[in-house]
Amino acid sequence: MHDANIRVAIAGAGGRMGRQLIQAALALEGVQLGAALEREGSSLLGSDAGELAGAGKTGVTVQSSLDAVKDDFDVFIDFTRPEGTLNHLAFCRQHGKGMVIGTTGFDEAGKQAIRDAAADIAIVFAANFSVGVNVMLKLLEKAAKVMGDYTDIEIIEAHHRHKVDAPSGTALAMGEAIAHALDKDLKDCAVYSRESHTGERVPGTIGFATVRAGDIVGEHTAMFADIGERLEITHKASSRMTFANGAVRSAFWLSGKESGLFDMRDVLDLNSL
């Protein structure tokens, strides 16, 4: 049973995603905005977090120090960058705070640090917090088991011009879901670039293509192509609120969990399907 009023802290409160996380936290019943963080020296420090997000005055001011707000939150929501997230992870582990991590672009050492911390605190770590994307991942597993052995598999993703990592975390999660269904390791079968004289396509590989343009929120397609037919499974996001709502929902779901590493499939109970 969930406790009432799970208090959340939002990292990167002044960013595009941070503002929508604030809106989502204020809107979800059973969740309370406890703290909002920005980097040291930000012009937004001292601002009211609700007003910053266009949601009205909340009385929660934007701070730069986790120490200053450590008694004001139960779960920390972080969609920033790997180096910052890992610093926040160490703090949360030390102080017994749950985490929802939507940051992408971690190297293997960063991912291992998250796995290690989950021995002591509860963490939801996902490449994408959209309900639709996580349903898509489940569909990809099913499609791969039926068609993966004989089709050419390609993953195409598109995002806005400001995204700093490629392929996207969601595209990689798609590749991992497909590879796992085929009893493969993605690092052994992924092809991330093609140029010049590449020769014919190598059977059994999973190709990736990346687009960065304009203000595209996020579009992902997995293609299973054979001679004579092609299956495409596509997800398109038109608003970051999709991700923000999923992240705050995950924070609420963490209530009462002391430790463990989870993802959105756990939150949505997709593993039972």
Swiss-Prot record:
Active site residues of this protein: H159 (proton donor/acceptor), K163 (proton donor)
GO cellular component, one term: cytosol
Keyword Cytoplasm: yes
Pfam families to which the protein is assigned, alphabetical: DapB_C, DapB_N
Positions of NADP(+) binding: R39
GO molecular function: 4-hydroxy-tetrahydrodipicolinate reductase; NAD binding; NADP binding; oxidoreductase activity, acting on CH or CH2 groups, NAD or NADP as acceptor
Subunit record text: Homotetramer.
Family membership noted in the UniProt record: Belongs to the DapB family.
HAMAP family tied to this protein: DapB (MF_00102)
Task performed by this protein: Catalyzes the conversion of 4-hydroxy-tetrahydrodipicolinate (HTPA) to tetrahydrodipicolinate.
Designated name of the protein: 4-hydroxy-tetrahydrodipicolinate reductase
Organism: Shigella boydii serotype 18 (strain CDC 3083-94 / BS512)
Organismal lineage: Bacteria, Pseudomonadati, Pseudomonadota, Gammaproteobacteria, Enterobacterales
